[in-house]
């Protein structure tokens, strides 16, 4: 699977759209609405702008980028309608903590939240203590961003040595450990 992650904030959706145009059906396309645009009407308009810039009829996963001033009820209602209209396949959130997630899933339509995209890597593991178990108990996958710590982990002497011993790259070890840790936490929470 090929995943391309963008957002209206990144100001690169047109470029991404051009890049995936010839292989759109083979790409899982993720985009995000800015919190300042996350009112009911604003979310729908932001999605329309993203679809236009991306040159696609649908977005595979559309996320609320982080919490803002607009009530979650409005954003969830807009996301649910966008999904029903076929403009997005799935919707979720990004950078939400456990309290935010509890609030979101308690709303009408909130159970449709597919994921929370959060910072997670060998150097940033705080979610293992609350958010990861919470999501695992609900069988909601987490989506890690910066899984190799923006590259800063790739030169850590321990990671380099483990990678050398297994004849793989430090990035492969970092991704494997992130994945194994996520699976371990999901498995232990389901017992």
Language-model-detected regions and their locations in the chain:
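CE4/NodB-like, metal-dependent polysaccharide N-deacetylase domain
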Residues: 43-63, 81-85, 107
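A short, structured active-site edge motif that brings together acidic residues
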Residues: 26-38, 61-65, 118-120
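Beta/alpha (TIM)-barrel catalytic core signal, keyed to glycine-rich beta->alpha loops juxtaposed to Asp/Glu
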Residues: 12, 67-191
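Short amphipathic alpha-helices and their capping/turn segments at secondary-structure boundaries
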Residues: 17, 47-52, 130-133
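Active-site-proximal beta-strand/loop segments in catalytic clefts of secreted hydrolases
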Residues: 7-10, 32-33, 147
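N-terminal binding-site loop/beta-alpha segment at the start of enzyme catalytic domains
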Residues: 1-27
